[in-house]
Amino acid sequence: MSSHDQRASGMNFVERHGLWSSDQFKAAESVEQEIQAQKLELVRFSFADQHGVLRGKTVVASEATKLMRSGVAMTSTLLAKDTSHRTVFPVFTPGGGFGMPEMEGASDFLMIADPTTFRILPWAPNTGWLLCDIYFPNGKPVPFATRQLYRNILASLSDRGFDFVAGLEVEFHLFKLENARLAPSDCTWPGEPPEVSFIHQGFQLLTEARSDQIDPFLEPFWRTIVALGLPFRSMEVELGPSQCEFTFRPMSGLQAADAMILFRSAMKQIARRHGLHCTFMCRPGLPNIFSSGWHLHQSLLDLKTKANAFVSDGAGQVLSDLGRFYLAGLLANARAAAAFTTPTLNGYKRYRPYALAPDRVIWGQDNRGVMVRVMGRAGEPTTHLENRVGEPAANPYLYMASQIISGMDGVARPRSGCVGRHALRG
């Protein structure tokens, strides 16, 4: 059936191009019912750009059902932005700077909702939210869409018999917003940074008194995160002034990256509505500040046995052979992967010796001074690797994809002497 015939038959964009699974079609029906049952008025359609920033449009609820299947048009310049939100490719030249006719002339692409991601936003009255994948009008996936790239990596990993399991440990700064800097003279490109003050003085790591001091600030955040259905685990007062940490239970595959995208965006929006400013910038330019990191806890699930593939057989080894080879791959590819684990210049300010942040490519068993911290013992089902290299501003899809590619390269090409069996005894 030609595209013209498909249009004539009344098929929508999703149906014409076979974009949804049966589970997604079922989820779409549930979304429609939920919109009506909850009397939602607005639905936000969002996608994660190259930097892991959510962009999108808000539509009235009565249009959401149709647009889930037909798509929401967006300008392709959104795929050509730097971190200051400037378009940095010549989009009005042949190929649009990408060598692709689809990117010429600031033309449109389409956001297609993933109905399984639907949430009702607790902080925005009568508003739903959908995370989207992005396609060109001809039905082809945007080849550099980071969520799709990560999904492809996960599919390749699945073909090898594994799924990726990740736990999020994310540091951030939460400030009082003293001056949002909205005067006309402040509205430069990029805009002037806000004036802020701290919510705690720092240097009292994990004290209960300091935790209680900031509890009134953190309560609306953790309550909202729980209401969103994210697997929230703990909140902690960190070492630096106005620095905090949230952790999440392990998640598999796409769920972990999607959770980080939603968490980060939610925190910023909730903060602004409460007169606060939340930033995942690694090292804000303020006196006495401490750098924030994003530690990515990771392991592989054996799809046949449903067991943790990093667990040793109990013969005195902390990691299985596969786990050792995966670790060796993380180490061998760490420099290349840094483009995705630490994508900003600011992130490199964190790499200092004796600063609880890695400044060299090394591993250790339960050692917070190394890049990759091996957690667990022989036969321990929760055995995993904690890569401490990342910054909180990293694109989750690219960060996690880089870990899988790096680790599985180590599995495919075992490196003798990189991580020897004798060095990993439990």
Question: Language-model features: where?
Answer:
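ATP/Mg2+-dependent ligation/transfer catalytic cores
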Residues: 2-234, 256-259, 426
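Core alpha/beta catalytic barrel or barrel-like domain that forms the active/cofactor pocket
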Residues: 165-173, 190-208, 228-248, 277-297, ...
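Catalytic-core signal marking the mid-to-C-terminal active-site face
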Residues: 2-18, 27-30, 262, 269-270, ...
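Alpha-helix capping and helix-loop boundary segments enriched in small/acidic/polar residues
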Residues: 208-212, 234, 251-258, 282-289, ...
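A generic structural motif
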Residues: 49-51, 135-141, 210, 250-256, ...
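Broad gene-expression machinery/nucleic-acid interaction feature
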Residues: 42, 127-131, 167-171, 243-245, ...
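Gly/Pro-rich turn-and-neighbor structural signature
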Residues: 249, 253-284
